[in-house]
């Protein structure tokens, strides 16, 4: 949200859009500015439904369509709109599909940067963001189980969980990787922050720090 904004309503974007936005900002934009992102490409591999739901499960993977001519699925469009509130005009495109799982969404990402970057640079940027968790686990079931056992009411509040060994840098400018989406958890944190912003516009950032102990560095 912009400072000194007169907005009475806000949109809290989806959990996958949170993930896309966090990864893009952390790796490509923060400390460099929006011009550092040449392009961002994303594949949202979505779970079929939540473990609490008895309906809408699918028997096999199902691919989505590209509804938007410029952005593909709504995820990149929503992330673009989010960054546009800061005056950024980003080159983003996403695709989406569902798989027959109830655990977690998976995000594949490709970020091309203007400035050269190394794998160690990427890791340092991810580790410097308190809202990013990293993991050596490569299955959604084991990360989901960790959240169930150790998360706040079973939820992971981090914006994303990056699989470290999946990260790859090509030609000094192209970053590839996979990360898991803490569905509900990351958008819940944004909802709390937005509410605090309305109530305490000048001190909301300090007030939400009471939740910082609920963020994981490593899963």
Residue ranges of model-derived segments:
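Long, low-complexity C-terminal extensions of enzymes
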Residues: 175-207
């Amino acid at each position: 949200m912009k400072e000194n904004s007169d907005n009475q309503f806000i949109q809290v974007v989806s959990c996958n859009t949170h993930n896309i936005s966090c990864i893009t900002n952390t790796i490509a934009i923060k400390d460099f500015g929006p011009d550092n992102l040449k392009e961002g490409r994303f594949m949202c591999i979505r779970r079929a439904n939540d473990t609490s739901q008895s309906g809408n499960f699918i028997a096999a993977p199902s691919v989505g369509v590209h509804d938007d001519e410029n952005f593909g699925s709504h995820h990149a469009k929503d992330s673009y709109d989010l960054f546009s509130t800061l005056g950024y005009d980003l080159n983003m495109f996403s695709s989406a599909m569902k798989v027959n799982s109830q655990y977690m969404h998976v995000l594949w990402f490709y970020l091309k940067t203007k400035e050269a970057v190394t794998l160690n640079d990427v890791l340092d940027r991810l580790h410097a963001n308190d809202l990013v968790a990293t993991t050596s686990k490569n299955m959604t079931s084991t990360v989901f189980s960790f959240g169930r056992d150790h998360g706040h009411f079973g939820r992971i509040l981090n914006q994303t969980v990056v699989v470290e060994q999946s990260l790859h840098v090509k030609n000094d400018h192209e970053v590839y990787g996979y990360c898991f989406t803490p569905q509900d958890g990351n958008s819940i944190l944004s909802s709390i922050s937005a509410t605090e912003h309305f109530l305490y516009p000048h001190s909301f950032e300090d007030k939400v720090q009471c939740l910082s102990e609920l963020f994981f560095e490593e899963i």
